[in-house]
Each structure stands twice: as structure tokens, then as C-alpha cells.
Amino acid sequence: MSLTYMNMLLAFMISLMGLLMYRSHMMSSLLCLEGMMLSLFVMMTVTILNTHMTLASMLPIILLVFAACEAALGLSLLVMVSTTYGMDYVQNLNLLQC
């Protein structure tokens, strides 16, 4: 296993641990999710480049599209919760139900 894979796996694991440990604030959860997506993107891109899989070269772009959609939805939810309640606690998401 090369050093690049080890670093990206370490970045993914640190982001996952951050998501599991610091889930009280929504902003920290969103940052951890973005870190996970970034490490997955780099691992996928390096794997495709190393194996010369030309048919799978669009997969990292598709992952980035989904990551951008996730970030937009997460930030809009963060803005809605913070303007409604004045704080970004994840526990306020249960209060948004009708």
C-alpha cells in the first residue's frame, strides 16, 4: 500500500471519527462529511489513474457532483436551523418536523 493511500485512508478515518465524536454541532458534522468526500475523491482518482481504467474516469466527477449537492443541502439546512433557533445544534433538527 502506497503512502498516498495510507494518508487518504487516515484522512477518511479521522473525518469519520470526528463525525462520530463531535455530532452536537451541525457545522462540525458537515465539515467532517466534506473531509470524507474529499478523501474518497482523491482515493478514487488515484486508483483510476494507477490502474488505467479509462471507462471509470467519470466516477470521481460524479462523486464531486453528489458532494456538491450534499454540501448545498447541508448548508441550506444549517442556515434554516440557525436563523430559526439561533444555534446550530443537531438536536434542533427534530423540532423541524410538522
Swiss-Prot record:
One annotated GO molecular function? NADH dehydrogenase (ubiquinone) activity
Q: What is its EC number?
A: 7.1.1.2
Pfam families (UniProt xref): Oxidored_q2 (PF00420)
How is this protein situated with respect to the membrane? Multi-pass membrane protein
Q: Where are the transmembrane segments?
A: 1-21, 29-49, 61-81
Identify the domain of life. Answer: Eukaryota
- Enumerate the subcellular locations listed in this protein's record, separating them with semicolons: Mitochondrion inner membrane
Q: What does this protein do?
A: Core subunit of the mitochondrial membrane respiratory chain NADH dehydrogenase (Complex I) which catalyzes electron transfer from NADH through the respiratory chain, using ubiquinone as an electron acceptor. Part of the enzyme membrane arm which is embedded in the lipid bilayer and involved in proton translocation.
Q: Which family does it belong to?
A: Belongs to the complex I subunit 4L family.
Annotated protein name in UniProt:
NADH-ubiquinone oxidoreductase chain 4L
